[in-house]
Amino acid sequence: MSFLWEDRAWEDYLYWQVQDKETLKRINALVKDACRTPFSGLGKPEPLRGNLSGYWSRRINEEDRLIYLYENGQLKIIACRGHYED
């Protein structure tokens, strides 16, 4: 499976590289797991609703979520900092 980073998600990822290595490790583990099993596994995956219908969320920590879209065998990472309401 391939994956790609939206611009915002990549900026988030670069932020974590500087700010918090433990959070970065958690994000890496979540991305790896989402590539293997997009709809189950680490971080309590849950489908989003409303204007984010079709997207999925996994918990990085209490405040931050990994938001992604799985489509046609590709994982598209939308954000990895903040919450989906942000």
Residue locations for each model-derived region?
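Generic structural signal for secondary-structure transition and capping sites
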Residues: 36-39
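Enriched for short, Lys/Arg-rich terminal
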Residues: 2, 8-24, 29, 42, ...
